[in-house]
Amino acid sequence: MRILFLTQWFEPEPAFKGAGFAAALRARGHDVEVATAFPNYPGGKLYPGYHIRPYRRETINGIAVHRLAIWPSHNASPIGRIANYLSFFFTALVFGLLRGRRYDLVYVYHPPITPAAAAAIFCAIHRMPFVVEIQDLWPDSVGASNMAGNRITRLLGKVCDFVYRRATLIIPQSSMMLERLHERGVPRVKMRRIYNWATYRPAGAGATVAYPKGFKGRFNVVYGGNLGQAQVLADAIDATACAALDRPAIHLHLFGDGIERQALEMHAAKVAPTHVTFHGPVGRDAMDRVFDEADLLLVQLKDDPLYTITVPSKVQHYLACGRPIVAGLAGEAAELLTESGAAIVCPPQDVPAMATAIGRIAAMSITERAAMGHLGQDYYNTHLGFDRAIEDTVAVIDEAAALWALRKRTSNEHHG
C-alpha cells in the first residue's frame, strides 16, 4: 500500500525513525513517502544546504521526502518551541489536505503531538486510516520539562485525547506507557506495544581503530545524545568527579548538543575540569565508532514518574554496542537493563550511587567488562532486534488497513 510517513524529524537530523525505517517498510512491499520539516534539530538552526521555503522535494536513499516549512527553534524559549511545533502542524495539515488522497495510510511519529493532530484532521476529511507511534507521553513530558504552564498543558491533553480517539491503532513504546494510556481511556484493543530497536551499525571487517580525541590512557565513560533538561547530566558530571577521586583515569565524554550544553560546560569547569570533555554532535556512524572504543556507556533521566514508563532508545542502542552500562533509570527501562546483565542500574539522580557504579566497572578487568557487554548484545538480539520490530510494525500497519476497510464496508452496508 502507499504509506505517508509523517514525522517532524528526519535525516540529516539525528532521527530515530528515519530513512532506515522507511526503507525497511519499502523492502516489505510498501510504497513509502515521507513528509517532514526542514532539518533544524537539535540546535534550532537550519542545516547547511537548506533554506526555509514553503516546500521542497528531495530523495534520500531512494525515498521521496517532502520538506515542509517550519519555524526553526529548539532552545529554552517556550515561545520559540511553540512556534516550531505549530508551524509544522499547519504546513503538515495543508500538505495532507492537498495531497493526502494519494496515500492509503498515514504513519505518524510522535513526539511532538502536532503532526499527529494534523493527521487526525486530514485523515478524517479524506476518510483514511492513520497509525500513531508514541515515543514520548504528552502532555506529561512537556509539563516535566517546564516548557509550558498549566493552561497549555491542559490544552495539549485535550489535543492528545482527540488524536487517540481518531487514530486507527496506536503503538506505545513500552508496556508501562500502554497502561498509562489505558488509564486515560484509550482501549487496550486499540494499542500494540512495540519496543524500539538500535540504529547501531558494527564496524566493517578490517576497520582500523581510530581513537577519539582524548581517549588514550583513560577509562572512558561515554554519553551520546541530547544535552537537555530531562537527562540531568550535571549529576553525571558530579558522579564522574566523585569516582575520579579514587580512580583519576576516569573521564566523561559528552557527545551531542542541546539547550543545557552551555550550563553543563560551566558546571564541568567548576567541579571536574580535567575529567569531562564536550565533543559536540557527530554523525551516526562516527558516534557508533566512539561507542566501540568506550569502556563504559552512561544513560540517565530525570527523577520523575513520567520517565518510569518510557524506554529511551539509547537503552537498546547501548545494549547492541556490547559495552558495559551505568544507568540512572527507574521503571521499565531499568528492568530491561537489569534483566540483560549488561548494566549496573542506580536510582535516577543518585550521584553517590552512580559514582559507585562507575567505580565498580572501572575496577573490573577487561575480560569482565567484555563479558558484561556480550550479555547485552545477546539480550538485544533475542528480545529487541530490528527485524522483529519491523515485522511487528508491518503487522500493525496491515491490521490498521484491514480494520479501516472493514469499517468502511460495514458503513456502506448500513447506509445501503
In which residue ranges do the predicted regions lie?
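Conserved donor-binding/catalytic core segment of Leloir-type glycosyltransferases
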Residues: A210-Q231, A236-A241, H253
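Nucleotide-activated donor-binding/catalytic signature segment of Leloir-type glycosyltransferases, i.e.
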Residues: R247, Q262-R289
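Short hydrophobic beta-strand element within catalytic cores of glycosyltransferases
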Residues: L296-V299, H317-G328
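A short, well-ordered alpha-helix in the C-terminal region of glycosyltransferases
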Residues: R360, T367-T382
